[in-house]
From Swiss-Prot:
Protein known as: Putative uncharacterized protein YNR005C
Subcellular location: Membrane
Segments passing through the bilayer: 110-130
Keywords of the record: Membrane, Transmembrane, Transmembrane helix
Length: 134
């Protein structure tokens, strides 16, 4: 899969537009905010332009899961909060617990750790949607 510069930019813009960032350290704060349910809601992908190559592996991993989820008839970026809450609220697995974390991937920070967490969150969502589809 090869993306032109404008396609890559458009993809990242789309991801950024649909996402919000929550610090991994603020889980307790999230659950205390009235009206904000304690489950996975959004993902923010944020790369500095000069770190594009460094962040490429994270983008490819995200794209892999988006494609797999879309192959099941779902569009990750179009899932509304209610659908995601239903998907994640019923999960009792350790992977499901990771869905409580909305990850920020920033190439200037701990990209590897955050990418791995996002990888598991998307894997959890994919497993749930696979079961829902069958």
């Amino acid at each position: 899969m090869v993306f032109t510069s404008s396609e890559s930019s458009s993809l990242l813009s789309s991801l950024k537009m649909t996402c919000s960032m929550v610090s991994m350290n603020s889980l307790e704060q999230i659950s205390l905010i009235k009206g904000v349910p304690p489950f996975f809601t959004h993902i923010l992908v944020s790369f500095q332009e000069d770190n594009w190559v460094f962040g490429l592996s994270a983008v490819l991993r995200i794209l892999f899961f988006i494609q797999r989820i879309e192959s099941l008839g779902f569009t990750l970026l179009d899932l509304n909060t209610s659908e995601i809450s239903n998907a994640m609220g019923r999960s009792r697995s350790p992977l499901g617990m990771l869905s409580l974390v909305a990850c920020s991937i920033n190439a200037s920070n701990s990209l590897g750790v955050l990418t791995d967490i996002l990888f598991l969150v998307l894997y959890s969502l994919l497993i749930h949607l696979s079961k829902k589809k069958s």
